[in-house]
């Protein structure tokens, strides 16, 4: 994978030192090459403001904000003493560069100033860190639980919080406790600074979800309505939370791969990619060219499958019933191809540390060539049925629109960002897995509205088909898995060669590989935007900290901005155009 440019190391670090004093920062070396700086909490807000708005080509995109419980970490060479570390990851799209800021906090009453005033996207991220780690953000407009239920005791991503049900008391839900839990979910407008009435009218408060079909999962949006007009909206997430990051601390590096399939569960093995690439970077594994191309081909098939589902449900939510049935037929053809060489449809867990699970079978290209000939005609038909439909255009053009600046302020990536006219695609900007060897275009929109978000994804399917065709025509020969001691599972044919290889195979399969200590963040252009895994290894067989940065999480945070002043029917189109699944949000 191409690393971020070194320009930020040459310019932004000295600039920060000049602005705040060289003795203020402590630099840390990480496996991903991103400039990582420790700084005191007292200059946090000013540093974020400086990076986001006071320099040329600013680091305006808050890619991630998370934390690490450092209390039982063994390998912290050269890092400041810290019980909890809060991590800020910012990206400059103009520089194509990243910077990572870290702040050390004590074990007792860990607290930081909130940066929401200078970076609106930090709102949910700070709430998540408070929810999961118990780190307080002073000055946050409404610091309350985000993922866990309001009545939850403790902070799950602390190391002293139980990781398994067997470590906790048996679960029971008496009637009185159930009533308390239900009451805790009641929406109280005053808690969100909302008025129940104005001079002219009494406002209506409506729960859209968590069981409404148009919210695409277990998800609630509490609406403040003046008649049919939306005055304000409060997205309520967490109903689909399964503790994916916590589980990463209790699974071996290899056995965690199936869990990644089920984050954006419509993206299938594409979810494996940033995770296995991150482990490979920590382990120093060079993946063979054939394996890289197989990964690209499978990822693009999953992109098409995911976009077909989006396309059909988008049309359905806006009022068309027929397209989704035809698109599901095409989606099944894609799954038939995927199943022919992975053995599974949606959750194949096909990627491995060091390569892929198996080589392509004999005659693997036949179904693909048939699909390449078939699919463009179907897309042309869908253009006539959906994109050219006057009802679709009236319902989606000018609805839920935002600018490029607003998208970056709210950490929007993927098709939602490109719909504003910015041609920023991670596969082009920072090619990984050999994407630099493929010819494809980056579709963009102009208005940043619901219609453009759909149009960008439709064109992306055509570009994915181009990439797949190049994979078929130029599939390299060679091994499908790296010859490396930490490749997992190791090549089976070596197990009976001698006792050393047999022992290595046994240990790798049972305990799992021992990955060297370090930190790394690897990001890909997933189906819904930028998907990244920030892994911390403490030199063991399991991850010390597994951070999953998903695109859908910040995208839902932007719903109030897009929906204020719109009608309830417009909100349905807005939700459909975002393209999210709740497992990708809640993790």
Curated annotation (Swiss-Prot):
Membrane topology: Peripheral membrane protein
GO terms of biological process kind: respiratory electron transport chain
HAMAP family with a match to the protein in the record: NDH1_NuoC, NDH1_NuoCD_1, NDH1_NuoD
Organism: Methylococcus capsulatus (strain ATCC 33009 / NCIMB 11132 / Bath)
GO cellular component: plasma membrane; respiratory chain complex I
Catalytic activity: a quinone + NADH + 5 H(+)(in) = a quinol + NAD(+) + 4 H(+)(out)
Protein name per its UniProtKB record: NADH-quinone oxidoreductase subunit C/D
Subunit structure and binding partners: NDH-1 is composed of 13 different subunits. Subunits NuoB, CD, E, F, and G constitute the peripheral sector of the complex.
Keyword annotations from UniProtKB, A to Z: Cell inner membrane, Cell membrane, Membrane, Multifunctional enzyme, NAD, Quinone, Translocase, Transport, Ubiquinone
Subcellular location(s) per record: Cell inner membrane
Gene: nuoC
